[in-house]
Amino acid sequence: MKTRYVLSCLLLGSALSVSAQKMAVKSNLLSAANGALNAGVEYAFGPKSTFDLSGSIRPWKRTEGYVNKYWLIQPEYRYWTCQKFNGSFWGAYLNGAQFNVGGKKMPFGLFPWLKEHRYAGWLAGGGISYGYHIMLNRHWNIEVSVGVGYEYIDYKKYKCPDVCAELLEKGHYRYFGPSKASLSIVYIFN
């Protein structure tokens, strides 16, 4: 009886290891360039399907006139057009964040009001993404991904970026447009 139990465990264990799925860890270089700590993990659960969970946090500010503190979490389902962790993928993602930003000029003229005021609040939304993995070798990849989606933003607007600035208004904003961008270095476990 004991021998059967041990053999059953060994067979089950070997069957699980044969069908073991790939897993990857990553870091978004765009988020890191902004001074944020970030990490992501992606798990393959089918021949063309993966689940990615990424997060980012920036708990400090740079100067008195510039505030850029936030945390963000983003789960995403990905469907790979060829094979997982190689080539093109389409994704559907959700995201949630809490922010305290102001005194910053955004690139490409986005959100020009952030230069003069400070905004604190939270957001939740989701969208669709497209990305591409470039294989460097067996373990290392580069990933580029962009997404378009909807964000519900609940905010408080302050007169200036100072922490003790006068509250001007409370409100919410519905945003539709680019809501995800990543350039990540990826390590794949086999």
Question: What do the PLM-derived regions correspond to, one by one?
Answer:
Residues M23, K48-L53, F85, H139-I142:
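Repeated loop/turn-to-beta-strand initiation elements of outer-membrane beta-barrel proteins
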Residues A24-G40, R58-K69, K84:
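Solvent-exposed loop/turn segments connecting transmembrane beta-strands
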Residues V25-S27, V41, L53-G55, P75, ...:
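Membrane-embedded beta-strand positions of outer-membrane beta-barrel proteins
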Residues L29-A33, G55-K61, Y79, L94-N100, ...:
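Transmembrane beta-strands of outer-membrane beta-barrel pores
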Residues N34, G46-K48, C82-N86, M135-N137, ...:
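Outer-membrane beta-barrel channels and translocator barrels
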Residues E42, R78-T81, G131-H133, V186-I188:
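Transmembrane beta-barrel domains of outer membrane proteins
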Residues I57-V67, Q98-W122, D154-R174:
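Flexible, solvent-exposed loop segments that connect beta-strands
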Residues Y175-N190:
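Outer-membrane beta-barrel "beta-signal"
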